[in-house]
From Swiss-Prot:
<dbReference type="GO" id="GO:0070318">
    <property type="term" value="P:positive regulation of G0 to G1 transition"/>
</dbReference>
<dbReference type="GO" id="GO:0071333">
    <property type="term" value="P:cellular response to glucose stimulus"/>
</dbReference>
<dbReference type="InterPro" id="IPR012395">
    <property type="entry name" value="IGFBP_CNN"/>
</dbReference>
<feature type="disulfide bond">
    <location>
        <begin position="41"/>
        <end position="58"/>
    </location>
</feature>
<feature type="disulfide bond">
    <location>
        <begin position="254"/>
        <end position="291"/>
    </location>
</feature>
<dbReference type="GO" id="GO:0001502">
    <property type="term" value="P:cartilage condensation"/>
</dbReference>
<dbReference type="GO" id="GO:0072593">
    <property type="term" value="P:reactive oxygen species metabolic process"/>
</dbReference>
<keyword id="KW-0237">DNA synthesis</keyword>
<comment type="function">
    <text>Major connective tissue mitoattractant secreted by vascular endothelial cells. Promotes proliferation and differentiation of chondrocytes. Is involved in the stimulation of osteoblast differentiation and has a critical role in osteogenesis. Mediates heparin- and divalent cation-dependent cell adhesion in many cell types including fibroblasts, myofibroblasts, endothelial and epithelial cells. Enhances fibroblast growth factor-induced DNA synthesis.</text>
</comment>
<dbReference type="GO" id="GO:0030324">
    <property type="term" value="P:lung development"/>
</dbReference>
<feature type="disulfide bond">
    <location>
        <begin position="290"/>
        <end position="327"/>
    </location>
</feature>
<dbReference type="GO" id="GO:0043200">
    <property type="term" value="P:response to amino acid"/>
</dbReference>
<dbReference type="GO" id="GO:0051385">
    <property type="term" value="P:response to mineralocorticoid"/>
</dbReference>
<dbReference type="GO" id="GO:0010628">
    <property type="term" value="P:positive regulation of gene expression"/>
</dbReference>
<comment type="similarity">
    <text>Belongs to the CCN family.</text>
</comment>
<dbReference type="GO" id="GO:0071897">
    <property type="term" value="P:DNA biosynthetic process"/>
</dbReference>
<feature type="disulfide bond">
    <location>
        <begin position="27"/>
        <end position="52"/>
    </location>
</feature>
């Protein structure tokens, strides 16, 4: 009798497991995967089962947005940090405390500082490397005695220096050069001493996306325990759907800070900001220059999700932008952290 019942019960159990509701954010009632084969992930990115236990997906990497459905790369010791137990919607992929860093073929302990080159001083923190430039990033504006300043690499010196070029075609006024400006952020003074603690804070990294919602990060020890910690904020340099080149005035080659017709609401993975914002965004150029944030500030933004849950995220707000020719080279990983090109985003 028991044997005769065991067969149907086992079959029913298997069917129940195969048709179980998927759990986690945005999981459908049943597992439904794309008909095509599993996605092809970039080199170094793991192919894992999604948080619903249904489909194979490319794991999210350090600093990327994650959800219960879109997991972080477990093979790199990453987990989805939601910030607080109340917020279980959207997090940021973070390395576990004490995770080492692998860079340039070398392994560095968490908390260890090193020079990646003569230009950058770096620190490993829980699997992530944060770097600050050692070379001066001063600005030299065009002047009568130096109308065409540019930075050049001099023999025997690590840091680039300013030199003055004579214009090829002299005119009465001459073309106006766009001066490069390092992004100016508001934070603690890096030289400030406090209770046996030298407060140090890296610059905010460039936004991970040149259009749409992205992530910007920095490393600081500006806290009660003087312990290095990673901070992240949302950022949007410009909306993806905006065709900004149409707004460039006749005879001009750039639009530095385009005017937004009406206040906007920000969207983040299906959640919408509670308030509307008359935000500023950076424009574009048609002559090869990059337009990037110059002055920014960080403010909290509340997002309301379809299920009524409210979550709060820090977000970058642009005060001014600068358009310049000092776009990063494709082979300089650290320059791209600060002065990322305004095209060719990798999804």
């Amino acid at each position: 009798m028991l044997a005769s019942v065991a067969g149907p019960v086992s079959l029913a159990l298997v069917l129940l497991l195969c048709t179980r509701p998927a759990t986690g954010q945005d999981c459908s009632a049943q597992c439904q995967c794309a008909a095509e084969a599993a996605p092809r992930c970039p080199a170094g990115v793991s192919l894992v089962l999604d948080g619903c236990g249904c489909c194979r997906v490319c794991a999210k990497q350090l600093g990327e947005l994650c959800t219960e459905r879109d997991p972080c790369d477990p093979h790199k010791g990453l987990f989805c940090d939601f910030g607080s137990p109340a917020n279980r919607k959207i997090g940021v992929c973070t390395a576990k405390d004490g995770a080492p860093c692998v860079f340039g073929g070398s392994v560095y302990r968490s908390g260890e500082s090193f020079q990646s080159s003569c230009k950058y001083q770096c620190t490993c923190l829980d699997g992530a490397v944060g770097c600050v430039p050692l070379c001066s990033m001063d600005v030299r504006l065009p002047s009568p005695d130096c109308p065409f300043p540019r930075r050049v690499k001099l023999p025997g010196k690590c840091c680039e220096e300013w030199v003055c070029d004579e214009p090829k075609d002299r005119t009465v006024v001459g073309p106006a050069l766009a001066a490069y400006r390092l992004e100016d952020t508001f934070g603690p003074d890096p030289t400030m001493m406090r209770a046996n603690c030298l407060v140090q804070t890296t610059e905010w990294s460039a936004c991970s996306k040149t259009c749409g919602m992205g992530i910007s990060t920095r490393v600081t020890n500006d806290n009660t325990f003087c312990r290095l910690e990673k901070q992240s904020r949302l950022c949007m340099v410009r909306p993806c759907e905006a065709d900004l080149e149409e707004n460039i005035k006749k005879g001009k080659k750039c639009i530095r800070t385009p005017k937004i017709a009406k206040p906007v609401k920000f969207e983040l993975s299906g959640c919408t900001s509670v308030k509307t914002y008359r935000a500023k965004f950076c424009g574009v150029c048609t002559d090869g220059r990059c337009c990037t944030p110059h002055r920014t500030t960080t403010l909290p933004v509340e997002f309301k999700c379809p299920d009524g849950e409210i979550m709060k995220k820090n977000m970058m707000f642009i005060k001014t932008c600068a358009c310049h020719y000092n776009c990063p080279g494709d082979n300089d990983i650290f320059e791209s952290l600060y002065y990322r090109k305004m095209y060719g985003d990798m999804a």
